[in-house]
Amino acid sequence: MEGAGGENEKKKMSSERRKEKSRDAARSRRSKESEVFYELAHQLPLPHNVSSHLDKASVMRLTISYLRVRKLLDAGGLDSEDEMKAQMDCFYLKALDGFVMVLTDDGDMVYISDNVNKYMGLTQFELTGHSVFDFTHPCDHEEMREMLTHRNGPVRKGKELNTQRSFFLRMKCTLTSRGRTMNIKSATWKVLHCTGHIHVYDTNSNQPQCGYKKPPMTCLVLICEPIPHPSNIEIPLDSKTFLSRHSLDMKFSYCDERITELMGYEPEELLGRSIYEYYHALDSDHLTKTHHDMFTKGQVTTGQYRMLAKRGGYVWVETQATVIYNTKNSQPQCIVCVNYVVSGIIQHDLIFSLQQTESVLKPVESSDMKMTQLFTKVESEDTSCLFDKLKKEPDALTLLAPAAGDTIISLDFGSDDTETEDQQLEDVPLYNDVMFPSSNEKLNINLAMSPLPSSETPKPLRSSADPALNQEVALKLESSPESLGLSFTMPQIQDQPASPSDGSTRQSSPERLLQENVNTPNFSQPNSPSEYCFDVDSDMVNVFKLELVEKLFAEDTEAKNPFSTQDTDLDLEMLAPYIPMDDDFQLRSFDQLSPLESNSPSPPSMSTVTGFQQTQLQKPTITATATTTATTDESKTETKDNKEDIKILIASPSSTQVPQETTTAKASAYSGTHSRTASPDRAGKRVIEQTDKAHPRSLNLSATLNQRNTVPEEELNPKTIASQNAQRKRKMEHDGSLFQAAGIGTLLQQPGDCAPTMSLSWKRVKGFISSEQNGTEQKTIILIPSDLACRLLGQSMDESGLPQLTSYDCEVNAPIQGSRNLLQGEELLRALDQVN
């Protein structure tokens, strides 16, 4: 038993010795192995602090990569570098905007420059020897394999095998926006623009002849340039760089103003236009593919391409485009481009697109210069000569053809000698704002302010007894076939004929009038549109005044026909003087008026005859005066001598003889200083009062007027006045504006007897000067609304006309004690109270 136990102990000891020896041997191998790796690590061209911390796998990986690089360098047949080249090598990486990477045909990174840490956050020894597919985006692997493939097939004659490579690669990046390094598991994707070529090395030349031929070594040499984000551009942009923003369809939504100096475009004219309109045609395919990569990978660099300048030629541009994503839904929002212009304008005299022809063919001078040259050019060019000139410049023909939507206006500057003046001035706009036509018909009146020649005579009217005279033509006069002298506030010297046969009236030229006005010390500004009108035959250049033109355009020319039936919200009190209800009277027809008898001289404050005249140049205003008649010889003598500057506006509505004497009625309670408001209707009212005395068969309006005028002002109730005003306003809105109506009377000029004048408070009035056959009798007509004018001016052959009562008169007047007396005001109220 003891012998068996001793044998077992011996076996145990021998096994322990063997194990110990094995452990020692393994320890020795590991130590030797470590020494070898240590020595090998120090043989690598790496810094000591890096090589001393490498594990065995990294040492082996880096050693293999080093050997491959040495093999490539030896196969390249590079000469030994001198000291100068060795010193320059350290500046290459600083000059590059990226890092260098060498890949084998399997995708192993044989070499990568040490500045990769600056752009990607990963160190050189962490990437060297690894497969590139371990650090790139999975969607880019297929494209990467295609780039690594070198096709050795037959090449067509005359063509070389394309070994150039340019593509975009998304690679892992451990750098944060603040420059810190994160874990590889949290890395983001960064777009690299990889450019380079495939290089094939033949390694058999340096190998000994042993009967074994190795395949050539293929590698891809790349320069990888990361594309900076527009928000993280560290280098400030110079004057040769401009920014632009585009929509997803590549249309400009913003452009930097520096493009004007570089390419000639204004930022405003690029907005809304596609960037493809400005690409050179030969670069469009390349840029289209680049834009596809941009939407796929987020960022691209276009490389150098040609972009068309505005006035011809092109410039070389390189663009870095970045897709900006929405932070909420991660959808693409817009595209921001940083454009680097790397050259000046090349072939600036060469046109590449239609957009460049717009700026080339556009004239430099302004539109005002063009219109001036168009109207001042007298000699006409031959059409054949013009056609020959245009054939030499075919590009200019595109500017001559009208575009869609253009308005074609035919300009005919040639005038036929046989063309009448009526046809030439057929469409001249007439500013009919002085004497207004009837509201019942649209009148075609040639006013004095229209630029009609003085030789044109008005058409003869129908019979003066026609009641439609006021509705058809209110300003045309039935006169002999003589030219009419037309006048307004502009002072003119008029020559009256010595005999009825010599009845032509001559106007002084506008040049003379303006000269006289300038020389007058108290020269006043024009007061009517007629002062801006010139004779067509006169020289417009000599009489053209800028001040007159400015005032002409300041005139109110809107209301061509103020009596048109249109609703207005204007208050009547803002348009006409206040006329109380108790001053109303029944309108009479014109045929019931009789010659007036003069009983007393007219007081200065009340004028019975409404006349219109022009005073001296110092006071060019229209006033109403009361005058008496003068003999024919005295009127002719004063007219011939041209001693009077007063211009009397007269008209001849009928052939009825006008009485030679005038008179006035007794002033009413509202006249003079007792009047609330000076009313222009007083004159006409007083004329009709005197007419009642001469016509026994007519209505006795004088008694009615006296009854109303005796009502004291303080007896009127304010409520009654307000109700009366409202009723009057409705009546005036229906019948027309009564403040235009003026009294009917005669105005004859008498030398030496000038009554005091009173300014009219209503609108401007226009009249004609007409000469009767005897040349002495003259009349004045003031136009009023057509409905009232028919009653005032309408001639009736029946002398026994019945009174015409309106619905308004029927409402407020109660006929008692005969039809001659109508109650008004308080008397009407008392009568109604008695009836009730």
Swiss-Prot record:
Region (CTAD): 796-836
Residue ranges of domain bHLH in the record: 17-70
Biased composition (Basic and acidic residues): 7-30, 633-647
Post-translational modification: S-nitrosylation of Cys-810 may be responsible for increased recruitment of p300 coactivator necessary for transcriptional activity of HIF-1 complex. Requires phosphorylation for DNA-binding. Phosphorylation at Ser-247 by CSNK1D/CK1 represses kinase activity and impairs ARNT binding. Phosphorylation by GSK3-beta and PLK3 promote degradation by the proteasome.
Modified positions (N6-acetyllysine) in chain numbering: 545, 719
Region (C-terminal VHL recognition site): 569-585
Organism listed in the record: Mus musculus (Mouse)
The protein's name in its UniProt record: Hypoxia-inducible factor 1-alpha
Residue list for modification Phosphoserine: 247, 564, 589, 602, 668
Effect of residue 191 to D: Decreases heterodimer formation with ARNT. Impairs heterodimer formation with ARNT
NCBIfam families: sensory_box
Region (NTAD): 544-588
Tissue: Ubiquitous.
Quaternary context: Interacts with the ARNT; forms a heterodimer that binds core DNA sequence 5'-TACGTG-3' within the hypoxia response element (HRE) of target gene promoters. Interacts with COPS5; the interaction increases the transcriptional activity of HIF1A through increased stability. Interacts with EP300 (via TAZ-type 1 domains); the interaction is stimulated in response to hypoxia and inhibited by CITED2. Interacts with CREBBP (via TAZ-type 1 domains). Interacts with NCOA1, NCOA2, APEX1 and HSP90.
Low complexity bias spans: 621-632
GO biological process terms, semicolon-separated: angiogenesis; apoptotic process; axonal transport of mitochondrion; B-1 B cell homeostasis; blood vessel development; blood vessel morphogenesis; bone mineralization; camera-type eye morphogenesis
Motif Nuclear localization signal positions after renumbering to this chain: 728-731
Region annotation ID: where it falls in the sequence: 589-795
UniProt entry tagged with the keyword Protease: no
Region (ODD): 401-613
Localization per record: Cytoplasm; Nucleus; Nucleus speckle
